[in-house]
Amino acid sequence: MEEIQRYLHLERSEQQDFLYPLIFQEYIYTFAHDRGFSRSIWSENRGYENKSSLLIVKRLINRMDQENHFLISPNDSNQNPFWACNKNFYSQILSEGFAFSVEIPFSRRLISCLEKKIVKFQNLRSIHSTFPFLEDNFSHLNFVLDILIPHPVHVEILVQTLRYWVKDASSLHFLRFFLNEYCNWNSVITPTKASSSFSKRNQRLFLFLYNSHVCEYESIFVFLRNQSSYLRSTSSGVLLERIYFYGKIKRLVNVFVKLKDFQANLWLVKEPYLHSIRYQRKSILASKGTSLFMNKWKCYLVTFWQSHFSLWFHPRRISINQLSNYSLDFLGYHSSVRMNPSVVRSQILENAFRINNAIKKFDTLVPIIPLVASLAKAKFCNVLGHPISKPVWADLSDSNILDRFGRICRNLSHYHSGSSKKKSLYRIKYILRLSCARTLARKHKSTVRTFLKRLGSVFLEEFLMSEENVLFLTFPKASSTFRRVYRSRIWYLDILSINDLANYKYKL
């Protein structure tokens, strides 16, 4: 336990960040509003315009400076109708400003990484950098732990977690008071309607709180994973002899320390290494070990959540699957490890043999049905996948309509460039192109056939050109080579966020 504390002590920031005075500064709320940290929270309260936002902040700060705190009880709000109407709005402004302030210590860590000029740091920030890692490692593994990160989390646990990172007691007391007195919940993420609506209005703050909770979990888990060779199972009587075996190994190290091949043979007594991936509210642990080894880690994680976070973590939230029968849906891809059969013909003198080999291959596919459902929700097609016009864009200019449809089509092609089967994207491109044609035909009050006959299909292809065509036009002499390259999987490491249309399933 002391070793874990030393590890966390080195990992966390030791700077004294006094953030509480920033909450009373007007420019903090201006930054939170202008830099896009809030999604037009001012427009939700129609009684105020953007030009009056500074006046609202001054009013809020004056209430905070008063002896009677502005976070009053519901009984007081009944006596003051004006405050009852604007209570949610003031809390929303305050949460955005507080979220902006409390992110400052974490932003310093990012700046320090940039100043150190870490090699390929920008590439590591890409969400697509996960897939090359999966291609290199998952095909050689046997079992996988599928973990659903537990929630809800008590407010006090979140405040205690932030205490290790933010060395400002006043800010933490203010956050505790804000969460307990205003919303009066026992948890940040709860199924009640009141808490869910509150978290939607204050999305930036609660995303930060949830991510800090997950960061605490990952910090300790990384330490446990790196020290996994010292986590020995002693519960089974069959394995008790291993304790004496490790003691013998320690004595043998002093004797054979000069032998070169001794260190190479130590892997026989070490636990298999764990590969971990987290995406949103799920976490995956994969290993080449046995089912007994994975069950041991399952017990470790259940005990860890219950002891460190005081959370009842049901073992059913962790499932053990064999990797050959496991599929993974995340970041807009359906990934799995499948067997790729191959036949090798071998001939020795007059005898010929055929050897059937099955090679594991990490496969990534685009789930068409959920993607079509996302297009239907965005009003590009109906639920059956038939393209329809976009009436909201019918008042725009022709070039603007074509530019919007073309940008969506190119972004989807760019995002799903790592798909093993590119032909599945043709249906998506077809829906977008025909939806664009119907939108233009609706604007000009004509049919799609008449519109395309008058302007020609080349007019649409000019704006809805896929990455494949752009690649061939850029390098016309090597079109056959680039065609083979395009058909293979390409992971672009400049993608920092999931595509909106591909984010169809996992939403926090």
From Swiss-Prot:
GO CC terms in record: chloroplast
Gene Ontology molecular function: RNA binding
Subcellular location: Plastid, Chloroplast
Keyword entries, A-Z: Chloroplast, mRNA processing, Plastid, RNA-binding, tRNA processing
InterPro entries named among the record's database cross-references: Domain_X, Maturase_MatK, Maturase_MatK_N
One GO term (biological process): mRNA processing
Transmembrane segments: none
KW Nucleotide-binding (keyword) present: no
Domain of life: Eukaryota
Pfam families in alphabetical order: Intron_maturas2, MatK_N
Purpose of the protein: Usually encoded in the trnK tRNA gene intron. Probably assists in splicing its own and other chloroplast group II introns.
Family: Belongs to the intron maturase 2 family. MatK subfamily.
Matching PANTHER family: MATURASE K
Name recorded for this polypeptide: Maturase K
UniProt source species: Verbena rigida (Tuberous vervain)
Organism ancestry: Eukaryota, Viridiplantae, Streptophyta, Embryophyta, Tracheophyta
Gene for this chain: matK
